Amino acid sequence: MKKLFLCASFACLGLFCSCQKDELVPEDSKPEWLGSSIYEELKSATHLTGTFDTYLRLVKDLGYDEVLSRTGSKTIFPANDDAFARFFASKNAFGVTSYEQLTPAMKKQLLYSSMLDNAMLASMLSNVKADDNNVSRGVAVKHASNISVIDSITTIYNGALMPQGNTYWDAYRTKGINVVYDATKPMIVHFTREQMLNNNITTTGTDCDFSIIRGEKVGTNIANSDTAYIFQTRIINQDVTCQNGYVHQVNDVILNPGNIGQVLRSEGNTKLFSRIVDYHCAPYYNAITTNDYNSWARQNGEATIDSIFEVRYFASAHSQDGRPNVLDPSGNPVAANHRLNWDLGWNQYYPS
């Protein structure tokens, strides 16, 4: 239920997307006073707490070690080995108990959920560009993560796991279907004290608004509440400056919880409500995602997929690009009483 409160809280707040910056910086162009690279900092943990062997294993397995050694503009939110041990010992979303059980797709979600393009101090997370000369502070609540849409493809083989009483899914109940739960880029959601105060969310005191949203005490004074949260994890070592970006250590492993539709579907005490809202969704064939995945598959010697579908909710107002979604997968109009007010599966939701 805590994740659902978080989803409901940030759904109505602002959006800021950073640009892609994976260019490599020559070794001789790095200023010495900045210290080591992000990769070297993770290996030495000079300014961090604990060891980061598991996180580094993800980095190496995904071929990202050179990027974090040389790329000029990155921000990462790593968890240490103790946090990963808790993750594997817990009832995690992947259902795995060891690193060896992780699939390549799971590894990508774990690493790229904790990474932003652009180098950002924790205090800058909620800032957005106002114009060429000014910045608006305490506005943004999310940034585009490094996760690709094709990293989140799911194959549903069991018809019982598809929305029940929904005829749009009947053609796939016996043969299965490959889906993404949204074809827009997954976001990293962050809560900073400045952003919350700008939205009249109190952050200190035992009964502050943020304690209620989190379901736990978050600090009784300003000093204790002045850190930032990434989803439900807290930054415990922030602004570790490296040659090629910043490291903000978090207390637990970051894993993108998905959009509101996914959270409702996964939480045990919201499954009935999920079944109600899933009556208003359908699988739409997505040619871009299909082509992107197959291009990657051919380059990496993997099997291609004939068709990948996107789960979308019928919406009278807010869906992708801020437009309504009032046509079904066949292009037929959807009755008004079969639409929601907004698309629960839209990762990049923003109020218009």
Regions found by a protein language model. Name each.
Residues 4-6, 19-351:
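Mature, structured domains of secreted/extracytosolic soluble proteins
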